[in-house]
């Protein structure tokens, strides 16, 4: 009997010890598992926090600039001054490219991989000297072609007079004023334009009017920037109203984009703002206008900013006579 009691007591004690071990070890195992899981999550988070960087390499002005940036971020591409003999157009991944850049100055580049950029330089010596005499006469559907603009338009007129003689102006008129923009157009330019149109009122053929204003209203004054969006809105509002008057006078209307400049040569104009102005204005002009995208044409094929009318200097804004003739030729072909 005593033996039996001892046996029962021993079994009970054994069972109790097993239970104690189970309840002691289980929480430790659970904590260990939890700790392992937490550690794994921390390691994963640590890996996720590791910033992946890419290198943007730019060769400019005889030096190589390397910039490390976060993958997926954006960088604003710089501009470069025009050296003697060429116009800087933008950037490309191809060395030695002379026109049609992949990227333009002040363009936002989305970086997802390492990239090496080279300047795209248009050599002035490669610009063709085209003949444009008689080009306007080939556009038979218009009785007259009127260009409206600023100093660039005035220099276009001077180029045609020098290169082709006064006869080329028989079918063309120019309403322009150096250094002016929308305010001048409202106060003086509109009246001058209608005076020119009045000379053709008796003709059955239409008059083509090509506007090329805007670059002077994008000037940074006193170090202050400019809102190209609001400037474009002001232009669109006025031009759309003017178009309704002009279409009743048998006119067909065109707006030629503000053409490129080089901010490094002319800090008061910014290339990205010219592009922004062109895009906004094109969207907001009404159906009475047809858009002439000479900006893209010049970027694709190149242009020269060594201007004969400025003492053969390069101010980054005004063009050579060869470029002006090419702009004129492009515009005439677009209105045919």
Tell where the protein language model's regions lie, with residue ranges.
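N-terminal secretory targeting modules
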Residues: 11-14, 30-35, 123-148, 153, ...
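Conserved SGNH/GDSL esterase-like catalytic core that processes O-acyl groups on lipids
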Residues: 139-230
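Catalytic His-Asp segment of secreted/periplasmic serine-dependent ester chemistry enzymes
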Residues: 261-336
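Active-site segments of SGNH/GDSL-like serine hydrolases
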Residues: 216, 245-275
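Sec-dependent signal peptide cleavage junction
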Residues: 25-47
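Secondary-structure capping and domain/repeat boundary segments
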Residues: 37, 44-126
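N-terminal secretory signal peptides that target proteins for export/translocation
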Residues: 1-9
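Bacterial N-terminal signal peptides
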Residues: 16-26
